[in-house]
Curated annotation (Swiss-Prot):
Interacts with GLI1, GLI2 and GLI3. Interacts with SPAG16 and KIF27. It comes from Homo sapiens. It is an enzyme of class 2 (transferase). Residues 4-254 form the Protein kinase domain. This is Serine/threonine-protein kinase 36. The gene is STK36.
Length: 1315
């Protein structure tokens, strides 16, 4: 503080105080912001530090400059530029500004925001109060308390920051947001400057949120078209369509007026917000936004407010009612828990409620807000507080609304229709009524009032009394609106349970169907229509879903569904429903019920749909024939309800409702295989009826394919039935009218309500026909160009994927279509980059992208298209493809999320998204990679060796046991699992098959080692692949183990973890009829025996001995017809015999086993002889009891001393040397072994053979007889000449290793030493 003079306080807020000051010894006027540290949490202090760090690096003429910051014992002091005032003061004084001044301010705000966004900084609290006025009329942006500097790994945020009046729609809905939220706020500020009020203003947070989300902006006539267009771009509710960078800079309203500050290149901050994201990053951003999207549809802002209001209402209720009413409430409440559905005849509960519990509040709070105009915003306390400070739980406040404490409960009048109308208005889901629904739910008196009204008025209705209908209809409408408007499923279900819903409703419906006198009343139709609306709203509630937080609601839902299904047949057969409204409403309610069933547990949905084939089959057949009987004279099954009017005399509502209900029964929701299991039998039943020779149902449904309203629903019905019935596919493939209708839909010649979805279903339908029939229905070959046009020119991702699926099927049948490479690559890139909206399960349990991947594979593997692979591998599509696959697999990423945001890191998901890419699609994608890398092998090296390679991460993940278990359980997963595994192994073999830089290869090995790929390969072979397909994984495993010691340890540790299972697999694999597999395994085992200690080798001994320890496996391997197998077996024995006493004992005790070992010495194959001589040599070393048995091998080994293979000569020399100390000197002398070894030592051309011979002679000369022979042969003289030859070598040449052994042997042969 010694640097500044503090002059006067100029502002005060929750943060602290702001003083005007002056820097000592200068005329510089500054603002000093004193922020107390006392009482602030660690989080608040961290946020303050972050704000200071952000401001410290900002240098822009339109952003307040932080000059200094420091701390005292009690405060943090921030020193900034001194501003002349706030922009908000101008609004206070002048109301609004001329457009030219707004234009100048707009250019400066955009300039400041461009600077922040180019540095990846979000302000997150743009409002007039945070815009200061500088000297000369300029503006400066300040208050960076909510600002966030986003790292390169951060794509979107979700934490609620800012002031509600200026919050964007995605922010108030708590959806992930990005920098475009700041741009929305700029639009609000500029609108307020020009008009005098914000574009959305309300004194209630509930009303404000609704306005922001739903209401259009009202445009005064005084705004110029250019300015209006500018604001329209900024105030676009969809952030993806909002005017943003870089287009914002070039808008005519500010073009040429924006100052762009250029700075020297600094550290790489990632892609600035002012530039368009590359496709691969856009894919990541979309995926992250999808992952972090809220699971419910309730904003946290409103949730907190609802909670406050509920607490407030209960608190005031207790204050005003006193102990007596509290006691009465306790005795009148329904006991919690799940009780049997209440019947209408039950005795009504006593109720102390008086009318108008909430009517007074309604009148005082909402009636005055009923005008459609935006109220002028009073300047005092006009802005809602910041959201983080708006709802402090410890200080609940009333948002200007009256509550139940102002109602005189003791002097209320009885119920009136007018009061129910007020309640209806209260629960209507219109912008100004967001508060009341939860208020009603939290009021127990309202719940009892509803229950009482239903009981009392319901009893009157059943007696045909008009007064009962007049009382119950308003209650119905209030209930319907309440069930539709409230999103708090827990509170809503609790209310329904307490009020006796849906039991009372369904009881009313049942009794009304049994009362003939009631059905004669003139008001009966209106009563049923409103009752059906309430039941439909109940079935649509989210607490009926399996994912609901309400545990006992599912049982109530199941009972209600069964009751409704019991009544549906009668409802559809009502004789006096001349207006068709009851049938329509019943069908709509049934459709909603089916949709709720689809999201439920397998047990509940299966029971429901199964009943349509048993006890409720009359409903199912009635629906099917109700659509077709009026048109054609068909036979209706006995008992099936009939629609009483011909279809041609009905409105379009009934056939539309019937077809919609049939589609709801048949169509399986995406990603819910359990639901399809339940519906499959229903589709079988319908398909069987459609395939009957005498049935006219099929032609009737086909004729509806060209009807604007029926088309989409009937397409779904026929498609679902064809999924289960090949016979129906054949019949439809031969129906000219069906094919013509489908072709016309593709060509856009049929006017339908939803062309996009209808076309998508048609494309999949035709794909299914080709797939099932394995040939082209007549005329389909002409569709190639139409479908290709849809694929390359549609911007709807689901259409692109569906068109690709059909093109792939057509291509397999030989249909040609003209696709330009640049066009189909662009189409594929768009489809893989944009968010996927999966509306229908493709045929064959395929994923959303499967058809696209199969088509790409076809296009790239056509003959003469090799150049396309090069173009594709260098395009954006290649990168986007692997990013999309990574997201489908839900791979974990490497950064951490903070403060409610989502970065590139995300916890790994337990299950891949099979709805996007199925096992078949994965196989196609890996085949595409194989084709690409075969053509462009260097691309493979760069993809796999690059640090953090997404492709390498994918390949490693595909070998993980957890993923393979998921793959095996996926639809058709077990079928494609071997293809996936083998493709991955082929791709991982590329670096070892190519000439790769040593450092890069080391990196690849380290990557595979760190992910325990060696262990995973062994587990894959053992648990997931048939024996005939393990050859390639074992080969890769062997390569890894031979090159990397850690991978070898992983192999051994995996065996130790599950010895019984894995040893069993290895035993079978060793004795398989696949020589390459057996050879690789033997090589792996031999390397293990050579490198690791004896404690790790017991499993190898077990493998060779067999379960009965007869060494049958070893005998089989030693006698194997393949040379490579025998050679690797001898090599393995050679390494084992260095350590294993058990194997030495077996050679001695097991009959014929040693003979098999020695038989290898005479093998025709030199490699086998070499390995056999190595094994015999190690058997001879310290042979002990085995020594005499090896005497029979001396002649053979002596003969091999003349073998042309140097390795064999070396091994045999060593073996013979090992036999000397074992008491076989006589046999060695008989075969003239000393003479032969001496000749080798002096004359063999290979130095290593000479060395082995000299070492053998040193060992043998210890036998007196052999020593004497060597002396008699003049060995010393001969060896001396050899030694002299070594000494004559130039000094620069290294001395051979044999020289040392030669000198020592000469010394040992001297007479003095001999004595």
């Amino acid at each position: 503080m010694e640097k500044y003079h503090v002059l006067e306080m100029i502002g005060e807020g929750s943060f602290g105080r702001v003083y005007k000051g002056r820097r000592k010894y200068s005329a510089q006027v500054v603002a000093l912001k004193f922020i107390p540290k006392l009482g602030r949490s660690e989080k608040e202090l961290r946020n303050l530090q972050r704000e200071i760090e952000i401001m410290r690096g900002l240098r822009h003429p339109n952003i307040v400059h932080m000059l200094d910051s420091f701390e005292t014992d009690k405060e943090v002091v921030v020193v900034t530029d001194y501003a002349e005032g706030e922009l908000f003061q101008i609004l206070e004084d002048d109301g609004k500004l001329p457009e030219d001044q707004v234009q100048a301010i707009a250019a400066q705000l955009v300039s400041a925001l461009y600077y922040l966004h180019s540095h990846r900084i979000l302000h997150r609290d743009m409002k007039p109060q945070n815009i200061l006025l500088a000297k000369g009329g300029g503006i400066k942006l300040c208050d960076f308390g909510f600002a966030r500097a986003m790292s390169t790994n951060t794509m979107v945020l979700t934490s609620i920051k800012g002031t509600p009046l200026y919050m964007s729609p995605e922010l108030v809905e708590e959806r992930p947001y990005d920098h475009t939220a700041d741009l929305w706020s700029v639009g609000c500020i500029l609108y307020e400057l020009a008009v005098g009020t914000p574009p959305f203003y309300a004194t209630s947070i509930f009303q404000l949120v609704s306005l922001i989300l739903k209401d259009p902006v009202r445009w005064p006539s005084t705004i110029s078209p250019c300015f209006k267009n500018f604001l329209q771009g900024l105030l676009t509710k969809d952030p993806r369509q909002r005017l943003s960078w870089p287009d914002l800079l070039y808008h005519p309203f500010i073009a040429g007026h924006v100052t762009i500050i250029t700075e020297p290149a600094g550290p790489d901050l990632g892609t600035p917000f002012t530039s368009r994201l590359p496709p691969e990053l856009q894919v990541l951003k979309d995926e992250q936004a999808h992952r972090l999207a809220p699971k419910g549809n309730q904003s946290r802002i409103l949730t907190q407010a609802y909670k406050r209001m509920a607490e407030e209402a209960m608190q005031k209720k207790h204050q005003n009612t006193g102990p007596a009413l509290e006691q009465e409430d306790k005795t009148s409440k329904v006991a919690p828990g799940t009780a049997p559905l209440p019947r209408l005849g039950a005795t009504p509960q006593e109720s102390s409620l008086l009318a108008g519990i909430l009517a007074s509040e309604l009148k005082s709070s909402w009636a005055k807000s009923g005008t459609g105009e935006v109220p002028s915003a009073p300047r005092e306390n006009r802005t809602t507080p910041d959201c983080e400070r708006a709802f402090p739980e410890e200080r609940p406040e009333v948002l200007g609304q009256r509550s139940t404490d102002v109602v005189d409960l003791e002097n209320e009048e009885p119920d009136s229709d007018n009061e129910w109308q007020h309640l209806l208005e209260t629960t209507e889901p219109v912008p100004i009524q967001l508060k009341a629904p939860l208020t009603l739910l939290c009021n127990p008196d309202f719940c009892q009032r509803i229950q009482s009204q239903l009981h009392e008025a319901g009893g009157q209705i059943l007696k045909g009394i008009l007064e009962g209908a007049s009382h119950i209809l308003p209650a119905f409408r209030v209930l319907s609106s309440l069930l539709s408007s409230c999103s708090d499923s827990v509170a809503l279900y609790s209310f329904c349970r307490e009020a006796g819903l849906p039991g009372l409703l369904l009881s009313l419906l049942r009794h009304s169907q049994e009362s003939n006198s009631l059905q004669q009343q003139s008001w009966y139709g209106t009563f049923l229509q409103d009752l059906m609306a309430v039941i439909q709203a109940y079935f649509a509630c989210t607490f009926n879903l399996e994912r609901s937080q309400t545990s006992d609601s599912l049982q109530v839902f199941q009972e209600a569904a069964n009751l409704f299904l019991d009544l549906l047949g009668k409802l559809l057969a009502q004789p006096d429903d001349s207006e068709q409204t009851l049938r329509r409403d019943s069908l709509m309610c049934f459709t909603v019920l089916c949709e709720a069933m689809d999201g439920n547990s397998r047990a509940i949905s299966k029971a429901f749909y199964s009943s349509l084939l048993t006890t409720q089959q009359v409903v199912l057949d009635g629906l099917l024939h109700g659509l077709t009987v009026p048109q054609l004279p068909v036979h209706t099954p006995q008992g099936a309800p009939q629609v009483s009017q011909p279809l041609r005399e009905q409105s379009e509502d009934i056939p539309g409702a019937i077809s919609s209900a049939l589609a709801a029964i048949c169509t399986a929701p995406v990603g819910l295989p359990d639901c399809w299991d339940a519906k499959e039998q229903v589709c079988w039943h319908l398909a069987n009826q459609l395939t009957e020779d005498s049935s006219q149902l099929r032609p009737s449904l086909i004729s509806g394919l060209q009807h604007p309203i029926l088309c989409l629903h009937l397409l779904k019905v026929l498609y679902s039935c064809c999924l289960v019935s090949e016979g129906l596919c054949r019949l439809l493939g031969q129906e000219p009218l069906a094919l013509e209708s489908l072709f016309m839909l593709i060509q856009g010649k049929v006017k339908v309500v939803d062309w996009e979805e209808s076309t998508e279903v048609t494309l999949y339908f035709l794909s299914l026909l080709v797939f099932r029939l394995q040939n082209l229905p007549c005329g389909m070959e002409k569709l190639g160009s139409d479908v290709a046009t849809l694929f390359t020119h549609s911007h709807v991702v689901s259409l692109v994927s569906a068109a690709a699926c059909l093109l792939g099927q057509l291509g397999q049948q030989g249909v040609t279509f003209d696709l330009q490479p640049m066009e189909w690559m662009a189409a594929a890139t768009h489809a893989l980059s944009a968010p996927a909206e999966v509306r229908l399960t493709p045929p064959g349990s395929c994923g959303f992208y499967d058809g696209l991947l199969i088509l790409l594979l076809q296009l790239l593997t056509e003959q003469g298209k090799a150049s396309l692979i090069r173009d594709m591998s260098s395009s954006e599509m290649w990168t986007v493809l692997w990013h999309r696959f990574s997201m489908v697999l839900r791979l974990p990423e490497e950064a951490s999320a903070q403060e409610g945001e989502l970065s590139l890191s995300s916890p790994p998901s337990p299950e891949p998204d099979w709805t996007l890419i199925s096992p078949q699609g994965m196989a196609a994608l890996l085949s595409l990679a194989m084709a690409t890398f075969t053509q462009e092998p260097q691309l493979c090296l760069s993809c796999l060796s690059q640090h953090g390679s997404i492709l390498m991460s994918i390949l490693k993940h595909l070998l993980c046991p957890s993923f393979l278990n998921q793959l095996r359980q996926a639809p058709h997963g077990s079928e494609f699992l071997p293809v996936v595994v083998l493709s991955v192994c082929q791709l991982l073999c590329f670096p070892f098959a190519l000439d790769m830089d040593a450092d890069l290869l080391i990196g690849v090995l380290a990557d595979l080692r760190d992910s325990e790929v060696a262990a995973h390969l062994l587990q894959v072979c053992c648990y997931h692949l048939p024996l005939m397909q393990v050859e390639l994984p074992i080969s890769l495993l062997t390569r890894l183990a031979l090159m990397d010691p850690t991978s070898l340890n992983q192999f051994v540790n995996t065996v130790s973890a599950s010895p019984r299972t894995i040893v069993s697999f290895l035993s079978v694999a060793l004795l398989s009829d696949q020589p390459l597999l057996t050879s690789d395994l033997l090589s792996l085992l031999a390397h293990t025996a050579r490198v690791l200690s004896p404690s790790h080798l017991s499993f190898i001994q077990e493998l060779l001995a067999g379960s009965d320890e007869s060494y049958r496996p070893l005998r089989s391997l030693l006698g194997h017809p393949e040379n490579s197998v025998r050679a690797h077996t001898y090599r393995l024995l050679g390494h084992l015999l260095q350590h294993s006493m058990a194997l030495r004992g077996a050679l001695q005790s097991q009959s014929g086993l040693l003979s098999l070992l020695l038989l290898g010495l005479g093998d025709k194959d030199p490699v086998v002889r070499c390995s056999a001589s190595f094994a015999v040599g190690n058997a001879a070393y310290q042979a002990g009891p085995l020594g005499p048995a090896l005497a029979a091998a001396v002649p053979s080994m002596t003969q091999l001393l003349g073998d042309p293979q140097a390795g064999i000569r070396r091994n045999v020399a060593s073996a013979l040397g090992n036999l000397g100390p074992e008491g076989l000197g006589e046999e060695l002398l008989q075969c003239e072994v000393p003479q032969r070894l001496l000749e080798m030592a002096c004359g063999d051309p290979q130095p290593n053979v000479k060395e082995a011979a000299l070492i053998a002679l040193r060992s043998l000369q210890q036998e007196p007889g052999i020593h004497q022979v060597l002396v008699s042969l003049g060995a010393s003289e001969k060896l001396s000449l050899l030694s002299l030859g070594n000494q004559s070598l130039p000094h620069s040449s290294p001395r051979p290793a044999s020289a040392k052994h030669c000198r020592k042997l000469i010394h040992l042969l001297r007479p003095a030493h001999s004595m």
